[in-house]
Amino acid sequence: MVKTPLISVISQEEKEKNRGSVEFQVLCFTKKIDQISSHLKLHRKDYLSQRGLHKILGKRQRLLSYLSKKNRVRYKELINRLNIRESKTR
């Protein structure tokens, strides 16, 4: 698996202060999702990695829905910075 450097969306100071914040957790999940997606492009039949990807996607989706309920402005900023599509409301 080739690791590619990602542009830091959150500054280094914010990383040190807010490791438990929703934004930081979503950023970490997004990095993992990108890494696993690139792995799955090479290894299409790696079903264990597919399962892990689905679990991480679900965790990120739950965090994003929590953030959208609590603070819509922070949610909009985060999805714009990370280039994530806005989830469909049911």
Swiss-Prot record:
PROSITE patterns: RIBOSOMAL_S15. GO terms for cellular component: chloroplast; ribonucleoprotein complex; ribosome. Keywords: Chloroplast, Plastid, Ribonucleoprotein, Ribosomal protein. Transmembrane segments: none annotated. InterPro entries: Ribosomal_uS15 (IPR000589), Ribosomal_uS15_bac-type (IPR005290), uS15_NS1_RNA-bd_sf (IPR009068). GO terms for molecular function: structural constituent of ribosome. The keyword Plastid applies. HAMAP family: Ribosomal_uS15_B. Belongs to the universal ribosomal protein uS15 family. NCBIfam families: S15_bact. This is Small ribosomal subunit protein uS15c.
